[in-house]
């Protein structure tokens, strides 16, 4: 039997119709979250350097947010999605405020920073209410780790420590894969 291009499977999976739902969801979730940190990274660099393309990068970040939200919309009712959309857009708005604060003052620790973490708590709480398989404490830690790494990258970049910035970004990729897999497992358990 020959395998058609693009239809290879990993060990333990099949190509039977309906059996790839988990694999497809996992791939989409991973790509969406990896794209999230990559697009935010490029946007922040363009913001810090005042590059002409920063609005294009910002638009891409918001388009990616729609992609992430669309994944959850397959599992959550419309009323829940309205709340999740509001929380996620607040996350992006606060990321902007934190970046602006750090750009103006490397020692920035203002209300936006505190609200950024509060928003992460709210997202973790919301998701764990919608998907009982999610452990809220574990999810909150993953979101905190994401914000910690995002902040550390911004600080390293603004300090001109590009090696550390890159190292943290590469670690953040693993964090996003773990987050995506955690989110996928919970959705599949619904």
Each model region followed by its residue ranges:
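Mid-chain, structured segments of secreted extracytoplasmic proteins
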Residues: 62-99
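Ser/Thr/Gly/Pro-rich low-complexity, disordered linker/stalk segments of secreted
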Residues: 1-15
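C-terminal amphipathic alpha-helix
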Residues: 12, 18-47, 51-54, 58-61, ...
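A short glycine-/small-residue-rich loop at the edge of a beta-strand within enzyme catalytic domains
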Residues: 82, 86, 107, 114
